[in-house]
Amino acid sequence: MTEQKRKIEKLTGVKGMNDILPQDAGLWEFFESTVKSLLRAYGYQNIRTPIVEHTQLFTRGIGEVTDIVEKEMYSFTDALNGEHLTMRPENTAAVVRAAIEHNMLYDGPKRLWYIGPMFRHERPQRGRYRQFHQVGVEALGFAGPDADAEIIMMCQRLWDDLGLTGIKLEINSLGLAEERAAHRVELIKYLEQHVDALDEDAKRRLYTNPLRVLDTKNPALQEIAQNAPKLIDFLGDTSRAHFEGLQRLLLANNIPFKINPRLVRGLDYYNLTVFEWVTDKLGAQGTVAAGGRYDPLIEQLGGKPTAACGWAMGIERILELLKEENLAPEQEGVDVYVVHQGDAAREQAFIAAERLRDTGLDVIFHCSADGAPASFKSQMKRADASGAAFAVIFGEEEVANGTVGVKALRGTGGDGEKNAQQTVPVESLTEFLINAMVASAEDGDD
């Protein structure tokens, strides 16, 4: 008896780290193109930092008593040199590290933006993944409320550009360090009076990071959090003036907002302004963008004291909203699919495809799937499935006569007839196709 072949195990991706397939990539490209145009309009420059950083960057920058550092980071020890490394869970600390390391602020403030994958070890659910993507901005060296207002208004302009509705702005002020210290004393006193009612997470944070107790999602603690001393009541004149200045600028630009005294954010580097853009269309994961001011962070990471603010938004959540509101654009096909029959025709077709690409047209040349010549019928089926506007047909007869067939697969051909096929001299092919596409586009606009 012959030995049966051992079945090879099929490998799959890591849970919570998703592939972006071709049918979805068009939506990603649409979003990326839209947001990049917006960032250029505000004078922001792209910065790209490594995915892996020293763990200390995040423990010092984000804060050791935070969910991200305590529970969510992908950290490991480099076997070669014993360095403690972490796959970035967010990118603000890394951008600040790069700005300090490369002395980027020596000649004045910088407006920077980034886009890329982040990593957090948490339970995957709708809109929340272990590998997720963010786009963010960092305005380094700007101290006034006008910078806060500008980065908030950038988000509003992006929602408008994408056609998104129902995303609401919540703002708060975390004040200055001495104001947070005074509030912390009173907050701990208040929470101690309710210690028996606190859950384990709140008890753990009571003396290490009590401000985060106010941000609890536990329904049983909502009343306690709601009645807790509010940080906004501890603000001094400078913090109040900054917060009021922000509100005036938002109102002057018709940006509606709600002041949420319990909005504290999950990272320790924030001060003064914090904000979130939230929606009720994504279930529990309602925050689509968030940010604020982090003036202490640059000094905290070894730079000179420098004011800064920024935001980050989760791309997957924005794309979910685009799908939810049927705003995803149709995926465009190529301009031309080149079909051929016979060896001489294949060679001429290959050359013609390259010449068409020289003019800026998007062209698919039919390649054999199994090495054997494909029938004309199967090639035309592939051409139609590709989404191409036109099929360009090279047959033996056409090659002998110095001509080529052109068939409109979408809309009308050069003579205005739907799905018409015409014979065109090879030397006139490019001009014919360009004119036919212009005519087809005009028909589509009518």
Swiss-Prot record:
Keywords: Aminoacyl-tRNA synthetase, ATP-binding, Cytoplasm, Ligase, Nucleotide-binding, Protein biosynthesis. Pfam families: HGTP_anticodon, tRNA-synt_His. It catalyses: tRNA(His) + L-histidine + ATP = L-histidyl-tRNA(His) + AMP + diphosphate + H(+). CDD domains: HisRS-like_core, HisRS_anticodon. GO terms for biological process: histidyl-tRNA aminoacylation. InterPro entries: aa-tRNA-synth_II, aa-tRNA-synth_II/BPL/LPL, Anticodon-bd, Anticodon-bd_dom_sf, His-tRNA-ligase, HisRS-like_core, HisRS/HisZ, HisRS_anticodon. It is found in: Cytoplasm. It is an enzyme of class 6 (ligase). It comes from the Bacteria. Homodimer. PANTHER family: HISTIDINE--TRNA LIGASE, MITOCHONDRIAL-RELATED (PTHR43707:SF1), HISTIDYL-TRNA SYNTHETASE (PTHR43707). Belongs to the class-II aminoacyl-tRNA synthetase family. This is Histidine--tRNA ligase. The lineage of its organism: Bacteria, Pseudomonadati, Pseudomonadota, Betaproteobacteria, Burkholderiales. The gene is hisS.
